[in-house]
Design a protein with these regions (language model features):
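Glycine-rich, low-complexity intrinsically disordered segments
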Residues: 1-158
Length: 158
């Protein structure tokens, strides 16, 4: 497929999240423990060597976000009138196109086909689309820049 071809893509979950968080909440994820259990055909061999990493990147589906409420324009993050209107791609809202989430979280342990993680901001039953080991070489090499409102927004997130 050429990069200019547009169309629908299908993905399938590779695992499911089990967590004490049953609903999306915007803050206090730092100490939330969760497990990710792989679905067939993936098994413990798919996780071989992952336990040598301290963190993983988890790509998941915001499955409870209403597909008909997806934001495409500007809005104030969390509806806060003190913050500027910004486009959906300038924020990390749940009701985004394709409803895809990405989280870097601590890998606590690997048991068979199950990962124990901490600070994964996904709720119970969340479909996991992919898992990647976090490697510092993929972190930005330049100084990270972000607007002041984003620091305020994230102050209590983790």
């Amino acid at each position: 497929m050429r990069s200019t071809d547009a169309g629908a893509y299908s993905v399938r979950p590779i695992g499911l999240v089990s967590s004490s968080r049953l609903r999306p909440v915007d803050d206090d994820w730092a100490d939330v423990a969760a497990t990710i259990t792989l679905l067939p055909p993936f098994d413990q061999s798919s996780l071989a060597g992952l336990d040598e990493f301290s963190h993983v990147e988890v790509i998941f589906l915001f499955h409870v976000a209403d597909p008909d409420a997806v934001s495409t324009g500007t809005r104030r993050p969390r509806g806060n009138p003190d913050w500027p209107e910004v486009g959906i791609f300038a924020q990390r809202a749940k009701d985004r196109p394709n409803r895809i989430g990405l989280s870097t979280c601590e890998l606590v342990a690997v048991h068979g086909a199950t990962l124990e993680v901490r600070a994964l901001d996904a709720i119970d039953g969340t479909p996991v689309l992919d898992i990647k080991p976090y490697m510092t070489e993929f972190a930005p090499r330049q100084r990270v820049r972000q607007p002041p409102w984003s620091h305020e927004l994230m102050a209590g997130y983790f």
